[in-house]
Amino acid sequence: MVKVTFLGHAAFYIEGSKKILIDPFLSGNPVASAKPDDFKSVDLILVTHAHGDHLGDVGTIAKRTGAKVVAMYDLANYIAEKYKGVETIGMNYGPTKVDEVEIVQVPAWHSSSDGKYSIGNACGYIVKLDGVTIYHAGDTYVFKDMELFAELYGPIDVALLPIGGHFTMGVREAAKAVELLKPRHVIPMHYNTWPPIAADPEEFKKLVGEKAKVVILKPGESLEL
C-alpha cells in the first residue's frame, strides 16, 4: 500500500517502503496541515523548482532527517551550497533510480528562481513506488507532451495537478491534462492558498467527469493506493 497525503498548496508526503516529500512548503504556508518538525522519517525530498512556495523547508527537513534531495541540476547545486551537509542529486530531465525508487524528472512550463536569479528549469516528477505510479506536475501549464508521459510511464495511478490558474493551469486546462495523462485518480493542488489562485475543485471534478476519479483532499487528508 502507498499512502499519499496532501499537506496543502503543492506539498505531499508519500509513504510506502520509502518515505518521500514533494515541495515541502510548510513554514509560512497559510493552509499547511503540518510543520517541518512533524516529519521524523524522510528518505527523499523532490523539489520541482526554486520558488519559495515549493523549495520551502527543504533544508531544515533534509538536515534533520538525512533525506536526499532530488532537484534540477542547477537547483541541486544551489541547495547544496545553501544548506551545507545536505546530500543532493541533480538531474536534467530523464529517468533514474534512487534507493530503489524509480524517478523520472519531466518538463514543466514554468519559471524557476529565488526571486532574483534564475535557477535552472522547472520540472515535474513521475515516481514509481511499490508498484504505484504517481505524477506530480509541479507548477505548469497544460502541454501536449503530457500524452507522452502516459505513453512512456503509464498507467498513472494518481496525478497531482495544479488547478489555481494565474501561475499554472486553471480548472479547464487541468481537465484537459487529465485527458492527456489518463490517470486512474487525480488530486487537485495549488489552489486557494492565496486569492490569485482561487479555484473551485468541484468545478474541476465536474469538467473531468468520468475520465478519472477526482479525489479532493483537504490538507492533512490522504489517498491510499
From Swiss-Prot:
Keywords: Hydrolase. It holds the Pfam family Lactamase_B_3. The keyword Signal does not apply. Signal peptide: none annotated. GO terms for molecular function: hydrolase activity. It comes from the Archaea. Belongs to the UPF0173 family. NCBIfam families: PRK00685.1. This is UPF0173 metal-dependent hydrolase PF1764.
